[in-house]
Amino acid sequence: MAVFHHRYNMSEVPLVIDVIDNGGQWTHREWRMLRYLKVDTQIIENSTPLEDLRKLDGIILSGGAARVGLTGELGNCAAYLELDIPILGICAGHQFMARFYGGDARESPAPEFGAMQIELQNGGGKIFAGTNQSQTVWESHNDEVHQVPKGFFITAASPSCKIQGMENEKGDRFGLQFHPEVNDSEFGKEMFDNFVAVCQEARDGKDSN
């Protein structure tokens, strides 16, 4: 089981973490999960100019119907990835993140749909902290990451998809191929909770400087 010691205090000024809508069918579930965790959150269209974003503590790049493995485009997500805040990419957001930083995302040889088993790799990193080594997640993808970028490591894998999760060495960029926001993902709430904790620690670090 992965271990990540963290804290965040929602009695203080709430964290501001927005969800970038890439056209995913479950984007509102990501927003609701953040609301449940007492985060100040909005759903933002992925065409929104960078200068129109609020002052954010973190961003989630949602999944979507876009075939990132084939087109390599996802609204203004490239500009958002330049921000110095923690970012979590889900499904298409994960694939785009990998491509943006020099990895490879393309069509899956074995697309996955429905409940699947994944195994944590390399300790699972921060997002999988407190979750089981083997767990059930909800998949819905035709494309996948085939190679993580330099400076990233694999955090989870399944028999048919070797990169179900990734994290950079700095610990502020995270990608998940599956959908933690769907109820069938066994530890989805814990994953969002862990991302919120990362955002809190990043804000605390900036405030102390």
Regions found by a protein language model. Name each.
Residues 50, 74-90, 95-190, 194-198:
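Pocket-forming structural segment of enzyme catalytic cores
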Residues 1-2, 155, 201:
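Residue-level detector of intrinsically disordered, flexible termini
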